Amino acid sequence: MTTDHRTTALLLFSAFVAVTLIITTWVSRHRQGSAEEFYTGNRLFSPMENGFAIAGDYMSAASFLGISGLIALVGYDGMLYSVGFLVAWLVVLFLVAELVRNCGRFTLADVVAARMRERPVRIAAGTSSVAVSVLYLVAQMVGAGSLVALLLGGTGEAVQAWTVVGVGALMVIYVSLGGMRATTWIQIVKAVLLLGGTITLTVLVLLRFHGDVNRLLHTAAERSGHGDAFLAPGLAYGGDWTARFDFISLGLALVLGTAGLPHILSRFYTVPTARAARRSVVWAIGLIGGFYLMTIVLGFGAAALIGPDAVRASHASGNTAVPLLALDLGGGAGTTGGTVLFAVVAAVAFATILAVVAGITLASSASVAHDLYASLRRSGGKPRSEVAVARVAAVGIGIVAIALGLLARDLNVAFLVGLAFAVAASANLPVLLYSLFWRGFTTRGAVWSVYGGLIPAVVLVLLSPVVSGSPDSLFPGVDFQLFPLQNPGLVSIPLGFLAGWLGTVTSTEVPDEARHAETEVRSLTGAGAA
């Protein structure tokens, strides 16, 4: 792009940041002193508003940039992410949404601790929630670095590094000043912008091929260099048995992980009733379903119009496929139309990243303040306000996410989110389901379930090809790879469920029938819910 066009792009790109900071500043003038206000916005959002906010929270950089990029590079196999992310919401709708809204108050640990000894359960669940959130944040940081480096016309490490630092600083400002109310409105605005941008690009791609989807697919296959194999399963996950098991592992993580994501669970506390929570999910499924169908068109459109080689040359993992597609659809590099469309898409993608990191940071800082701090602080001293602790925690989590984002900047963002989903499905989902549905579940079972899924998931990732042993690893110069799969879900998810069962059957604790009955009635009817 020319200097003038880059200036235009940067002005459009900066507009959303300005709008979101105005929203945050306006909200910060309202009283944010109570935990209820800071964590849930006083539960004043309607099902439609919360549905748009959930969609805004869920349609992350992994969805917009990563999935389309993977489809552009590996075709059919990249669609697994689109299908997995969408199907996961059926688990949320039928098993989690209403029950979590009725049983909890602010965090996942509230649901589990309702019938267990609070301290060990809150420490375990809080630790797990922070681990999942940080992994998810890293993916958003990587997406931001790739996007802004492309926007500025450079792919140097310094540009990406400063972008990651800038995103981290913005997310801390959003959460510290605005809390849930500002975060929710940022997510709603972002969801509208993202859907509008995605619809526009999808229509332009289909118009380029005169509405002939068959022609679009065959053109993508021809330019891919793989022929019809580009449109069939197996290009990425069918080479050998290890790849096939990786396929199964990733599918399990995507389908089961959503119900264990802390920032998604926290959204159910922002509506007044369980019925509103369920209606929120219905709204979210409609919005998210339409979006993921369009990412498939964008992925194959990038393969057909840009070509996998050009996408890979811009970013090895395909994270810049959609911005490059927008540039081409608008008229190409050097044209005003191409630059404006590119800048709009870049601004929308950046809005996506900012909104998601704000939601994740709020959820993880809530876990630190409401679960970890409240459980670990020494008695006798003057306790600090939960909200004050949450604001400090947001800063600490931001620093950790920035550091890891700098380390992982060359990985595909959809792939990174797949790892976060695997940890969520391994550590959070088993304890959540056992707490809601198993009458005999005990405190030991809850603690073992969390750590029995969390520790294996993290250790297997560290020992996988993601970290070492291959040219695409985080540390390509060393090799301590012992686990062959890139996603640990196939092993760590069953281990989480097994550990919860084993901890319960070996526990000498007698399950509290009265508290279980109370939790069951509350989860099903909403009686006594906050």
Model-identified regions with their sequence ranges:
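Helix-loop-helix junctions that connect adjacent transmembrane helices in secondary transporters/permeases
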Residues: 67-177, 267-418, 527-530
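Loop-to-helix junctions at membrane interfaces in multi-pass transport proteins
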Residues: 2-6, 42-45, 66-80, 159-160, ...
